[in-house]
């Protein structure tokens, strides 16, 4: 051992067991080593020893492991495997809320005394499903999974042994193991989210837990739910490894608890559950009141358990009993028996001097006997009397008071024990009936048995419990030793025999022929047998060699004996051994019970007799086999088996079962006696580690090679211990073989370990002796320290050299600057002289130039003024000339304009007079015509002619329109020519202006003449105004007369308008019909039929009931010619032939309409052929059109199946084929859902979107149809009210069906998308390293080809997946809201599953992985933004914040507080899990323990706050570390948006579809639509 100064070690401590210490002095004087240790509490301790390497020297401290290993998940990986190291590792993990730790093959489970439901969720079950032990952190489920996989793969039965002292958590652990087996899935579907629903068998198996706990568990000083019996549950599997049943074996029920409970303890839970949960009427029937009123329930004091609702537990127990097949009547009978037991406990026996008496009229006795259905007198008799049967007679004697009490309690214990066994037998009958028994292929047994017990007073129960633990410990030691041997043989290494403590002498002491149990049975069979006489026999027989090594008697007293168990010596008090071992009830009481009228009690007693007969037969068989080996007479004596012998026999059977299976061990530890949450008592845990054999396991491991490393792990960790020339090549090699790695391993070992016995190289691993890893770690630490020092030295040398060079350069630079300054000063002086000379020359030149420029400016100004004066004179002359021209032009135009206005006015007056005379004549004529009766006929005739004339005019107008179009073109040409002419005119205008200027002078002369004429004209104008006033008066008079005549004319017109309106309506109808004929004939030539939205009249003569026609659609079949549709080719009729064509169509209608309807009815009625064609040809034989970035699909290419179905459905409704339509639709709905269910692979996305679009189309049609029925009165025509209601009901039901179909296929499709995405997401988001230069290095590059798995998916695959969804939805016309719902759901799913995977991967929680994760998630965010999903980032918050957590500092409390603010979406439990599992790189400092404890304390406080309901902030608290992914059922996003508009339907049948009947239906519908149009 190395105890250099600074070495960390462990020193014994009275209160803590062990305390950390550090060597502060190591001196060697006088042949002795003197060590001084500084303990963690600052105490200084001195140690003197002669040899520091003497492992057996108890005074030496034990070496401590490096900090990185102190909280290891497997204790066998500790460098120093010693008691304090194991204790400290468990304590460190416990303080970080990790209750599970491996110790080789053993799982150590430390009871948290707190609710940790998050550790046992369905998500956690699925996380461990299919994983090898060691892949994830230690857990109960890892052991269960290992057992399940070994059973499945090796076809070998398994056993899980759960042991520990009372209150350690055995029962809970066993319960969760059972839940795991009932919930785990197959390996190939282990990654799929498990459905919560379990099979009925699995539910029944889990239901056994509350039953067994109610009848077999009780509150003790150490545990509120202590199992007072042992249980071995066999979970049975068939050949397909499916759970088919279970079997339960129980061991040593603590019968004495029924009649006696120590202070603060309780009786079995079932009694308190009855008091709290039974209805008042039932309690009255059973004469029950309160728990405190019954002696069997009130001895312990408080009858309540904090945090437990007995009424709620009662309901759980009753439900479980019902589930396992125990009827309500039988349950009532059981409750009557339990109530009777309580009344028996209250029976008051009267005490006399020598005996006891009990009256048959005692109230409690009467109640008990009434409930049990037995005779009260006989029962009371045998309570106070006993009967001894001799060969010749029966002797009845009285019992004293204490014996009577024992007799009374014995009956109660007998009945309760029999009831417990009967319950177990009934459960086994239900869970393992003959049909199940025939299918059993393998089983997994879960043994929940008491741990080693030692109290101040240890009795028969403790003796049996410790005996069982001795047997289990022996098997455990042998199993561990066997596994060690198998590992060494498998790896082909040299090894020597490992010695371990064998407890066989202790077992022989108990179970040999003259052992404790044998002597106990012998004494129990004697009528006068007593505890004292049995004790003397023990002393005489066993307190001598060789048994005195494990047996001894106490120094004082004769009422105890001491057994040296493997854990420690236990002193047993002999009081009550004989009575408990006998476990008998008097024959008199037995006869009384057998005469009961309670059927359930009779069944219980019969079951007891059957069990006794089986035991006797087994003993007879054993004796016969023994007799065959030893000849001689065989004498059999019928003896009632004792409790000890039965327990021994069942224990032997149990050990045989365990030895025939592969065993797994779970050791439960109780961390403190006060049951305080998360409190750790070192001494208490240490005693349990010794008692449960964990330290013995470690000792066995230490004797061999406890530390094992794979070649890869060893090379990656310790390659730096050899010169880089030896390992440099292996890193650079492209192809690295295993031989290369092993050669590096050998070079490392040769360079570091001189003693070859300290290690062995196996086939796949390197095995090290204890302490070697610490030695290698120290070498590695020293090497890294030296390397760091060397690096620092080089860096510092470079730094100071750089500083020297900078100073030297600065000095040179300063010198250069000074020299430069002096030279510049001298040059400056010279330059100043030169500048002065230059300034003088410049000044003189400037003065001369200024004089010259002044003279030049004066001359220039004089010239400017002269030129200005000349120009102003010229402009004035021009202005006067222009004014004269303007005046001349005005004067010349005045006289001709005045003359024109007078002439125009006169003309208007003359026209008005002439028109008045004409109107008067017309009015007289109209009055005459109005009186004529024949005038109307003539008007009508003229109007008809006018219609014809207008029709001809319309044609001429069309012709004129064409001519006008041509005329426009000609005009456009003319416009262009006009533009050219305009240019010419502009030129001419300029020339004309010149002429005008010449003319101005002439006009000035005429101006004066015009002014004179103007005055005379004004006088003439005044005369004309007077004349105009006279004419206005005459006009007003004519106007009044005209009004009267117009009123008469208006009356005449009204009559005319009525006729015109009637005639116009008729003409419009004729015109619209002609246009319809023309349109239909045109459409027929194109293969298209369009019908109006309004329905047709129902076919009452064909239909069974009234129905409305939904044949309001446009049928288009681009692949069918007019001949295929059986339509005669017609040209579009001209206006002149309209009447003739319409008449011909009318004649054909009567002939063909009936034939078409009959054929349609025949095709639609035969649903078998139609259904087969639609389902197989259309629905199953569908083809999805290609969708992509550049592909634009029309709606008919996408929803053609829906359009075809709508046509067929519409025609069925038209003919009243409601039953056929229901059958047809049922087949359609089932087929579509089945098609979507079978989608997989690359077809999943496009085909799923395709069917979503079609189902939406169908649903929209049905909604449109329903709305039309309810809102339009025309649909009621031809139907009775009942038929109408029936029809509304049919369509409403169909709407619900299509709504359900949309919901179902959306959920099926989305779940399939999630399943497909799950395969890619974890690899792409979590595992792939897309960011170059930041490889996390979980595996080295040069070993990847040998050990690492290649990545299957990258982020490109994820983005391709989402792109495929986007383009398919866009191409198939899916609403944007649906796309948004689908993608956000998938993003949330990716966030959840990736986070759940990441939080369970310890080696992925590093800062480099944080960078990679951040990069991958950022790519998803960018995709969301580019596709309009602004809230996509919110769906990935857990991954985003986890990436941040892995990259930021976590070394101070302030860092943690900041981190909590950043990672607001993560719960405290998730933060604690991530931080505690953070993988520290070699160049990082480990996260301090106080920080880990601080984070754990936050979780504890949050949990306490949540459980107490005092969360003032209202925050939701979740202790689960997993995010529950949303796996359905999902809300159908289509239900949240409006249905599609449905004006017309376009049915498109692709050419590749083979649908002859469907095409014929479309053909006939087309013909009918054409005829209906005519």
UniProtKB/Swiss-Prot annotation:
Changing residue 1262 to A: Intragenic suppressor of MYO2-2. The modification Phosphothreonine is found at residue 1097. Pfam families: DIL, Myosin_head. GO terms for molecular function: actin filament binding; ATP binding; calmodulin binding; microfilament motor activity; small GTPase binding. The modification Phosphoserine is found at residue 1121. The gene is MYO2. This is Myosin-2. Residues 4-57 form the Myosin N-terminal SH3-like domain. Changing residue 1274 to M: Intragenic suppressor of MYO2-2. Residues 1226-1501 form the Dilute domain. The myosin motor domain binds to actin. The IQ domains provide the interaction surface for the myosin light chain MLC1. Residues 784-806, 807-831, 832-855, 856-879, 880-902, 903-932 form the IQ domain. Changing residue 1301 to P: Causes a vacuole inheritance defect. Keywords: Acetylation, Actin-binding, ATP-binding, Calmodulin-binding, Cell cycle, Cell division, Coiled coil, Motor protein, Myosin, Nucleotide-binding, Phosphoprotein, Protein transport, Repeat, Transport. Changing residue 1297 to G/N/V: Causes a vacuole inheritance defect. The modification N-acetylserine is found at residue 2.
